[in-house]
Every structure is written in structure tokens, then in C-alpha cells.
């Protein structure tokens, strides 16, 4: 049998997208919508606006598998369901062939002086550095510009590499060569390990909580 990558969420159980059994399978894509499923990519700030083809936005879906609402939570239901369409909270894009790609979670998006920065994109680039074993990107408040954030990278180095200022400078130089200036991490913190779920997914929220506690905030 074949193993095909797909996509779905609890509110659209069990699945909304799948790579085709017969036909082209694209690396990094969750495939195309399954039959009777409608999908559109909408503006992150205004779900009534559809973004141009190839641009990132929030994934919105409609179909028989979309849930009817949250039990006894009418406000949450109203926030997530719009005329039968569900706002997924996932940032994605569609290519010219109708294949969809997941970019990141909306809640993890970083606002750098009005520019949208997606942590996963930066993490994928940093994983290409020979010294990096694991990495997580989050946004931290910019005290000079309320409502804006600065990019911070938590880095776990591979065995044999030293946690030095020289290594931080090397990583920043690597970022400057491979990222737009506003995406380059302003802060780099070395750690021996990153908080992860049982299946190995980095928990960015725990890192955000650590930063909040350092600022004296309650979490």
C-alpha cells in the first residue's frame, strides 16, 4: 500500500486534503482538497478577502466534515464558523496546480514592524546550518514599538560545537545571507534542549511563557 500525506483537524474530522493516489505528489504539500470540500486562502486580518494565488493567508474550509460548533461555547463557535466556513488558524498557500502547503500556525506568526514573519520558515533555514541540532523561533515584545515584536531564536547545538558569542555571530551572519533583514533574529539563546511534546513537536508556547516570566508577567 501507499502512505500519502494529508491534512485535517479536529473541527474537520477526519481529513480535508490528501496527496493523490495516482498523479503528481509534491514534496512539502498536503495535497489537494478531497471531493465535496471547498477551500480558500483568506487575508489574515480580514477573512472576507481572498489573497492572490501563491500568497500565504489563513486556510478556510467548507464541506460535510466541518463541525457544527463547540459544545456550549457559542462565542468560540461564532469566532471560528463563518456561514458554514471554518477558520482553521493555519497559515497556508496554494500553488498554480491546486496543491496546498501549510506555512505555520496563525497564533505563532510574528509581527515585526508590520511585516509578517512565520517561525517555521526561519527554522527550516536555520536547520541548514551545520552546527544546529534543533531550533525554535518566537516573537518577543519590542519595547521601542508597542504592538511590534522582535525575532528570537532558541538554538540547540550539535555535539562538538561551543556555545560562544562567536557562534552566535556566525549564526546571525548565516541568517543575514539567507533571510530578509527584518526576519533575522535579534536575539539568540543557546539551550541544551527544547520543550517538546510526546511526539517531538517543539512547544513554542512554553518558550513564550519563559520569556513572559522573565519580564515579570504572570502566565
Regions of interest found by a model, annotated:
Residues 6, 42, 103, 138, ...:
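Solvent-exposed beta-strand sheet faces enriched in polar/charged residues
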Residues 210-219:
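Acidic/polar alpha-helix N-cap and adjacent early helical turns
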Residues 36, 131-134, 181, 187, ...:
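Glycine-centered tight turns that cap/initiate beta-strands
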Amino acid at each position: 500500500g501507499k502512505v500519502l500525506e494529508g491534512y485535517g483537524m479536529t473541527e474537520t474530522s477526519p481529513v480535508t486534503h490528501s496527496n493523490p493516489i495516482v498523479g503528481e505528489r509534491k514534496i512539502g504539500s498536503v495535497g489537494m482538497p478531497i471531493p465535496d470540500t471547498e477551500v480558500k486562502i483568506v487575508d489574515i486580518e480580514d477573512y472576507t478577502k481572498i489573497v492572490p494565488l501563491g500568497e500565504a493567508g489563513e486556510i478556510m474550509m467548507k464541506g460535510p466534515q466541518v463541525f457544527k460548533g463547540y459544545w456550549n461555547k457559542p462565542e468560540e463557535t461564532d469566532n471560528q464558523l463563518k456561514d458554514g466556513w471554518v477558520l482553521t488558524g493555519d497559515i497556508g498557500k496554494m500553488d498554480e496546480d491546486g496543491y496546498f502547503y501549510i506555512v505555520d500556525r496563525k497564533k505563532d506568526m510574528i509581527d515585526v514592524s508590520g511585516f509578517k514573519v512565520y517561525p517555521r520558515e526561519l527554522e527550516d533555514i536555520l536547520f541548514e546550518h551545520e552546527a544546529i541540532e534543533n531550533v525554535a523561533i518566537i516573537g518577543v515584545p519590542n519595547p521601542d514599538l508597542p504592538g511590534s515584536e522582535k525575532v528570537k531564536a532558541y538554538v540547540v547545538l550539535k555535539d562538538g560545537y561551543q556555545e560562544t558569542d562567536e557562534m552566535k555571530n556566525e549564526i546571525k551572519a548565516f541568517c543575514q545571507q539567507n533571510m530578509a533583514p527584518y526576519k533575522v533574529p535579534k536575539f539568540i539563546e543557546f539551550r541544551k534542549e527544547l520543550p517538546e511534546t510526546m511526539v517531538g513537536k517543539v512547544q513554542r508556547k512554553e518558550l513564550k511563557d519563559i520569556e513572559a516570566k522573565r519580564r515579570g508577567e504572570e502566565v
